[in-house]
Amino acid sequence: MEFSSLYFLYLFLPLTLLVYFLVPGLRLKNIVLLAASLLFYAMGQPVYVLLLVGLSYANFAMARCIRPGKRNTLLLPVVVNLAVLGLFKYLDFFLGIFGITVADGGVMLAALRGITNGLNSIGFAFRSPTSALPLGLSFYAFQVISYVADVYRGKVKAERSFFNLLLYLSMFPKMMQGPIVRYEQVARQLMDRRTTPRAAFEGAQRFIIGLAKKVLLADYAGKVVASLSTGGAWLAALMFMFQIYFDFSGYSDMAIGLGRIFGFRYCENFDLPYISTSITEFWRRWHMSLGSFFRDYVYIPLGGNRRGKARQILNLLAVWALTGLWHGASWNFVLWGLYFFVLLSIEKQIAPKLETLPFIVRNLVTMFFVLIGWVLFMNTSLSGIGSAFAAMFGGGTSFAGSGVSLQLKNSLPLLLTCLIGSSVLPRWFGFLWSGLFGMGRSDRRGAVTVKKGIYLASVFLFLILLLWLCTVSLVGSTSSPSMYAQF
């Protein structure tokens, strides 16, 4: 079930919030939130709820056995979680490398269908799975690995309540596509939090803005991408660049907003990556929770930059190969990760020279290389990558004669909206607007109250307008699945 579906927006979420805020006490609220999270997951893939609960209990038990400083106690949970991720996500990929032909849908999907049929034969009524990859498994695996690693490091204590750990791992706002929230960030909030009217309003505001990013920008950009032929390779790459940003950052906004409504503060995941002036800066702003995971749990433990340049390069190679593979079991993702490894390695050598260039030049050069990276990302086959680059760099039909000029003209309003939406302008406008109304100072207390009232009313009306536009769009056609749901 997608956050951007009418079923979620007007049935599941309102009912969940109604029950959550009606029940007294944090313990009952946590029970409601856990039940809603498991139901949310079951609506997508019912049989995988058993895997979610079972794997969570295994990690609960293994974490209790971890002893700080004793690596063997950490090795088991890390291996178990990586093995589960590998079986579901990478088994068919590696079998293919060794020339082993797999059945249609893959080995794990066939096995899961057999298990489902067996359970149904003894009275269960599970729907046969259509995908071998449980929803959100990559995000789940990294969250639980960060948890057991932090227990080993002594940063957090092993959770004594399986209920609390399961709630942390399965909370539906962040379960499917992150952010990758660490246990230490929410451990205290599991047992001590409250939702104020202000927090609920801020959460709703963040959610609706994220919904608008997904429905009004990402989905329409995706339609342009799908409609273009190879003659429009440059326009397709540019629209995909905006599609994936608004799709994923929109989901992150919705997740963070929902968490805020329930009293949680999740980590940020995006910070205007398309205003970056270097590849290094881009990755500090893009999917920040994934970048910090690889930094803290892979790059630094491998030695980081403390053991000489040669070792640093090898550590970067490991990080970016894993980053590519995390996104998918396909060669294009491996190439995508290695591509950024090469760019970052070169950039480290020439960074002082680049800093002398004007901001706009550095930004345009950075975005050009990011755009090339998205071409690798969006084409799942090597032949597709080759065709795209051939069309972009001289091997395709001419721009004027391919009909793309008309598509560019038709897409120009959306393109400009995406360009503005991914810039710093909306943030500046928000600061200006709040300064004019919400943060205005006055000698009279009543005047300040009136200004704040006008500000809140204007924001409320703007959010209602966005929600209405999203609803109209969703009634006309269903929203496309979130792009990172497959990861």
Residue ranges and their predicted role:
Residues 1-486:
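Membrane-embedded transmembrane alpha-helical bundles that form the catalytic cores
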